[in-house]
Amino acid sequence: MYYIGIDLGTSAVKLLLMDETGSIANIVSREYPIAFPHPGWSEQDPADWWAAVCDGIPALLDGFDASQVKGIGAGGQMHGLVVLDKNDAVIRPCILWNDGRTQRQVDYLNGVIGKDKLSRYTANIAFAGFTAPKLLWMRDNEPDNFARIEKIMLPKDYINYKLTGVHCTDYSDASGMLLLDVEHKCWSNEMLDICGVQESQLPKLFESWQPVGTLTAEAAQTLGLPADVVVCAGAGDNAAAAVGCGAVGGGKCNISLGTSGTVFITSNTFGVDKQNALHSFAHADGGYHFCLLYTSPSPR
């Protein structure tokens, strides 16, 4: 039996084939571009992500029996805003985690709504990279596009949608949207009201390991895989990396250095940093939370 891991990074997708013992059988990477249409902006076309996956998976399986693939799990860059219309077509390029255009919206959330309220609603305060400020930016600057939004997704969730046809996300990734009530693991009605969106526009929530569906007939044919391959909800990249490093349960520290740098400590119980210096996110191990501090490079 084989399992496929998808890591949707900022500059490339990394694909891994693993057998049932946990041994790595093959690794493939495919790059895609980042657009910087204005100073401080950072965007990608979700179609480029999917094209890279479709090109990479057949190469990953070259020399292996594709009929033995039983499951797929995706992780990836967090916070990016993917918006779909009523036909599930992408409305505009994804605004990435390292995009800096939303400072005015961040100032509104932290200053007018207030950090204390945000912390109560979501266990976090606003940062430019988070998803909610991007929604407010769209509402303020692209009202026609904002009015067309049928579904709001994160980057790896778009890949899961293309694989399964299901609009879904997991708690670890959703924690970085500033739309999730992290403590109670549900969408925050207060934040939805602030951002002017409905819960029906948001994806269904899952634990990272839970199956969300199997491959659509189209995805199975495109990728050369059986249609009964199970796809799990997956996780945000840092939560997924933490599990891979053994940072599960309480009192473990994980440091990740990539396009961004992250440091977080796992916890068995929910908590909020009263100084607002750390983020409180759901973890991919299910029900546990960790505090996250990251540094982001500035886009061009």
Each predicted region: which residue ranges?
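N-terminal glycine/serine-rich phosphate-binding loop of ATP-dependent small-molecule kinases
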Residues: 1-92, 120, 148, 220-221, ...
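Gly/Ser/Thr-rich active-site cleft segment
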Residues: 2, 8-10, 21, 118-238
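Short beta-strand segments
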Residues: 73-76, 153-156, 234, 254-260, ...
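Carbohydrate-associated surface elements
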Residues: 99
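Catalytic phosphate/nucleotide-handling subdomain of diverse soluble enzymes
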Residues: 239-293
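Conserved small/polar residues in nucleotide/adenosyl-binding loops
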Residues: 294-300
